[in-house]
């Protein structure tokens, strides 16, 4: 079981992710709707894994990823992005993202990405 922080400005995406993760035995310890809030919750709670939407208001997922990796270079972050954002995905790899999931996401893909990281913890 992993402790997971879900960062996404879409209430629907957060709800789906939370339900899916909990169904698979993981604990969603917090949610955030903006990247800067996600970063602050990361610093406070130190989750095992962060799922991070790329496109969010104020501080986007790429900026939040950089902040989290600056705080802890070993942080495990799964980026979630809309299809067609190849340049954003390249940036996220540059800044240390562990996995990518494309919206609309396939539930099995999410579980596979989480389990891959859990196995390496």
Where does each model-flagged region fall?
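Short, conserved "switch-loop" micro-motifs in signal-transduction and mechanochemical regulators
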Residues: 83-84
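C-terminal output helix
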Residues: 105-114
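Receiver (REC) domain active-site loop signature in two-component systems and cognate sites
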Residues: 56
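Two-component/phosphorelay signaling modules centered on CheY-like receiver
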Residues: 11-30, 117
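Acidic catalytic/metal-coordinating carboxylates
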Residues: 34-37, 60-63
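Active-site beta3 strand of CheY-like receiver
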Residues: 45-51
